[in-house]
Amino acid sequence: MMSFNDYIFYEYLKKTNWNIHNLYCNLTQTADNILNFEIPSGVSCQLSSLTSSNFASGCKISAMPILNGSMSYVYTNVNLENLNRNITYNLQHFYEGYKHVDVPFVHYVNEFQDKKLPLRPTLLYGRMHLPSQHLDAIFATRLSPWLLFFIQGVNEIEDGVGDNLCFNWQYDTGKRCLEFVYESSGAMLGVRGLWNLNYRELNTKINMENKAPSNMRWSLGFETYYGVLTKCAGASLGMRLHSGPSHPYAPFILTCTLNPIVGHITSTFSTAEPRTKAFSAQYDFNIYSYESQLKLGIELWRSKQEMSQSTNDPTANSMSSLLKGTCSTSGDVSISWQARIRNFLLTIGTEAQLTKIDPLFFGVHFEYSK
């Protein structure tokens, strides 16, 4: 389940019209959400509040095996007042699972003015962990309709290594998206890129008027990085095929990534029936060692009809609970149940290794937002 702070950052990007699906780092986002969901650690409770249209705060307490906590604050000059009634109204807003790929968006010069956004939409985030005094911070800003720049900082006071800063610069034109990354700890430089191959067909007015958009969309991308201090390098190639809005059957996403250095190939297939169920499969294969693994995941949604707060009339169905499960040929099994109970979001999960004599891992997470 998406945390409250992640939800605020996601809404910031959404309201500033930034397409997160056009990034190479999110190429396999849907499969990762279904197959690699997080199991709560021990028992944790989180309280969050959107105190104004621009400011949010939260605190978290965790127990078992050790007692710790954190305090966080988020500020943005983007108006978030419409989130007040959505935060606890629908589990769908915090749902991390099948996310279909958005249509590539064409940015233009007066985009911020037309959407009544600030000239430089900005977000500030800070979190302090107790008692470790570990600090996290994020500064994000839209330099232009085509550019997003953000800095992530980590400070470990008890660690002698010192601070670690990650600078990320993203440039999105719709047809392609480039991402440049620099990390200070290892002086690592990285470049990512993603190209939409049938972009012209999807966005040319003449083609849109004369024929329907293609039911299939192709994307190709790459990633490469090099650590100046660590002398380590890496690279990967990837492709994505997904259904378009006029696809007559269930939506799907097919991806394939290759790491040529270690010879690792990963392919995923995800599909869903909206607001009912979702399925994902991942197959890993190494061309050097011939090792392979198959992983399957499923989601089952339960929805109920909500009543409009203003007219008391029935509205569209909203997600009230979600059951997720995964299994793999290596014997890993994970199960998670997420539900909304009034203003509380509840997550219960467990995971086990069937081929080893290991104890079950179990966790419970409560979150209250207002």
Swiss-Prot record:
GO terms under cellular component: ERMES complex; mitochondrion; SAM complex
Entry text on domains: Lacks alpha-helical transmembrane segments, suggesting that it resides in the membrane via beta-sheet conformations similar to those predicted for other outer membrane proteins and porin.
Sequence similarity: Belongs to the MDM10 family.
Organism field: Schizosaccharomyces pombe (strain 972 / ATCC 24843) (Fission yeast)
One Pfam family per UniProt: MDM10
InterPro entries: Mdm10 (IPR027539)
Location within or outside the cell: Mitochondrion outer membrane
Membrane topology: Multi-pass membrane protein
GO MF, one example: phospholipid transfer activity
HAMAP family referenced in this protein's UniProt entry, alphabetically: Mdm10 (MF_03102)
Keywords attached to this entry: Membrane, Mitochondrion, Mitochondrion outer membrane, Transmembrane, Transmembrane beta strand
Protein name in UniProt: Mitochondrial distribution and morphology protein 10
General function of this protein: Component of the ERMES/MDM complex, which serves as a molecular tether to connect the endoplasmic reticulum and mitochondria. Components of this complex are involved in the control of mitochondrial shape and protein biogenesis and may function in phospholipid exchange. mdm10 is involved in the late assembly steps of the general translocase of the mitochondrial outer membrane (TOM complex). Functions in the tom40-specific route of the assembly of outer membrane beta-barrel proteins, including the association of tom40 with the receptor tom22 and small TOM proteins.
Record-level GO BP terms: establishment of mitochondrion localization; intermembrane phospholipid transfer; mitochondrial genome maintenance; mitochondrial outer membrane translocase complex assembly; mitochondrion-endoplasmic reticulum membrane tethering; phospholipid transport; protein insertion into mitochondrial outer membrane
Subunit structure, interactors included: Component of the ER-mitochondria encounter structure (ERMES) or MDM complex, composed of mmm1, mdm10, mdm12 and mdm34. Associates with the mitochondrial outer membrane sorting assembly machinery SAM(core) complex.
Location (main, coarse): mitochondrion
Top-level taxon: Eukaryota
